[in-house]
Amino acid sequence: MLVRDLYQKYQIMPQLATHMLRVAGVGKMVAKHWKNGCDARSVTKLCLLHDLGNIVKFDLQDNIDRSKFGQIENLKYWQGIQRAVWEKYGKNAHEATIGMLVEARLTEFVPFIKEEERLYFAEAREEMLDKASTEAIILLYGDCRVTPSGVVSYRERVNDLQDRYGARNTTWYDWTFWFEEWMQKQVSIDLNSITEDGVKTLFDELLTYTI
């Protein structure tokens, strides 16, 4: 099945599909330049699937915050899709994503999804990252390069998260600086050279990935 067909099957909102395409574009570029080598295709596929169930946590009220979602065509339709997804998979985005992956027989990606979440909340340092999968590490980074408006610098995304949700604690904010520097050491490319313009050129290719 092609990625675009999977997105259609699970009725992924355009905004959510674009988010995953952006993360996958970042992930693909990072993986391509990973110094120790990695399975770039596996990394990219993981990024294309990592938020499949996220519609369950979107605030799709009639007075929706368009600064987060932009213009949504047929809002009533997407409210109905959200209710259907709630009924089938629940209201936890992480569990909904895993439920969809299991149903689609893509269970090989489930451990990476769970691992990425553990790394983030553990504020993983070198000892933990040395034992982690490259797939989860690159997803962790790529997801922190994308805002609703596009691919941005890592620091801009961290500040965006802090502004919107508040820093979880001071150690988290300090850790983000460390992790950004650690990631740069793992690749043979200037991470700041990965931009929205460069990532957008990959969208058509990414939608035709076979999973």
Identify the role of each PLM range.
Residues 12-43, 107:
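Alpha-helical phosphate/pyrophosphate-handling elements in metalloenzyme active cores
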Residues 7-10, 36-161:
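Divalent metal-dependent catalytic cores for phosphoryl transfer on phosphate-bearing substrates
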